[in-house]
């Protein structure tokens, strides 16, 4: 029987621990969030993060970019936040305005303030399994927390990550590799027949491609663990990349959408923020 991985419940536990850590620190903890106010999704997401942060005792400084924002203007903003001792962590909410080079912006964030672990320095250390006191991108780290909470064995397992974005796929690949899984990274140019073969062999499948019904139960190895990072809207309803109903009869574990990875992402971002405060502001 398939067990549902309840991200909302695990996120609640994570948030309780974060709130206790914030209270114990006894100093202001502030997360600066740079975002494009023209993007409806970003505005909504930033609002959700700010509300949850406030509930945990974390202050937020939401900074909308100008309508005519350029790479240079956003880099200058990041530089000012890097130099501001009152700012604990910095989050660059993707997507930024058209024409702004996101990778340059991510990598301009000082490693000791990189709340989402997206800069080149931090991601390079992740791939070298040498993160020390830095943080990991919130979505893949949230997935790892979820797997750990449910005591899902990763060691020696065959894992398949579908999607190679800087926010999800690449750090997810590194985290699973560092946990001693044998990991395959598939992407939009992976031939369909090759992907089908990978799916049939994978013990753990983590997918985030933004395509509803991308994976069916018949694609999977019986007993596979399925982590759905996708978020799509079909007829006004939030759905993932996995056909949930068909996979339920095949998988041993599965995350629902909503209520799976999504709550873990926000909880992990705020957990990252208090970690930076403890390591670099205490």
UniProtKB/Swiss-Prot annotation:
It catalyses: (6R)-5,10-methylene-5,6,7,8-tetrahydrofolate + NADP(+) = (6R)-5,10-methenyltetrahydrofolate + NADPH; (6R)-5,10-methenyltetrahydrofolate + H2O = (6R)-10-formyltetrahydrofolate + H(+). Homodimer. GO terms for molecular function: methenyltetrahydrofolate cyclohydrolase activity; methylenetetrahydrofolate dehydrogenase (NADP+) activity. NADP(+) binds at residues 163-165. This is Bifunctional protein FolD. The keyword Oxidoreductase applies. GO terms for cellular component: cytosol. CDD domains: NAD_bind_m-THF_DH_Cyclohyd. Its EC number is 1.5.1.5, 3.5.4.9. InterPro entries: Aminoacid_DH-like_N_sf, NAD(P)-bd_dom_sf, THF_DH/CycHdrlase, THF_DH/CycHdrlase_cat_dom, THF_DH/CycHdrlase_CS, THF_DH/CycHdrlase_NAD-bd_dom. It comes from the Bacteria. The gene is folD. GO terms for biological process: L-histidine biosynthetic process; methionine biosynthetic process; purine nucleotide biosynthetic process; tetrahydrofolate interconversion. Pfam families: THF_DHG_CYH, THF_DHG_CYH_C. Belongs to the tetrahydrofolate dehydrogenase/cyclohydrolase family. Catalyzes the oxidation of 5,10-methylenetetrahydrofolate to 5,10-methenyltetrahydrofolate and then the hydrolysis of 5,10-methenyltetrahydrofolate to 10-formyltetrahydrofolate.
């Amino acid at each position: 029987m398939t067990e549902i991985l309840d991200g909302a419940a695990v996120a609640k536990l994570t948030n309780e621990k974060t709130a206790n850590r914030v209270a114990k620190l006894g100093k202001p903890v502030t997360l600066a969030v740079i975002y494009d106010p023209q993007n409806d999704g970003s505005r909504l997401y930033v609002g959700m993060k700010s509300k949850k942060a406030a509930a945990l005792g974390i202050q937020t400084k939401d900074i909308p970019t100008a309508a005519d924002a350029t790479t240079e203007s956003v880099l200058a903003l990041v530089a000012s936040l890097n130099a501001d001792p009152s700012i604990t962590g910095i989050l660059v909410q993707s997507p930024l305005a058209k024409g702004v080079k996101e990778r340059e912006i991510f990598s301009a964030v000082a490693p000791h303030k990189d709340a989402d672990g997206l800069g080149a320095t931090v991601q390079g250390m992740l791939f070298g399994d040498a993160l020390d006191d830095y943080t990991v991108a919130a979505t893949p780290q949230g997935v790892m927390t979820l797997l750990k909470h449910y005591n899902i064995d990763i060691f020696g397992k065959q894992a398949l990550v579908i999607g190679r974005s800087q926010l999800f796929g690449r750090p997810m690949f590194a985290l699973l590799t560092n946990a001693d899984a044998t990991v395959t990274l598939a992407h939009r140019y992976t031939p369909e027949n090759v992907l089908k073969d990978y799916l049939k062999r994978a013990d753990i499948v983590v997918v985030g491609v933004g395509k509803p019904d991308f994976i069916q139960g018949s694609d999977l190895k019986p007993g596979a663990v399925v982590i759905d990072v996708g978020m799509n809207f079909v007829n006004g309803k939030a759905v993932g990349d996995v056909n949930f109903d068909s996979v339920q009869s095949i998988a041993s574990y599965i995350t629902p959408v909503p209520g799976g990875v999504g709550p873990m992402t926000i909880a992990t971002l705020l957990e990252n923020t208090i970690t930076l405060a403890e390591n670099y502001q205490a």
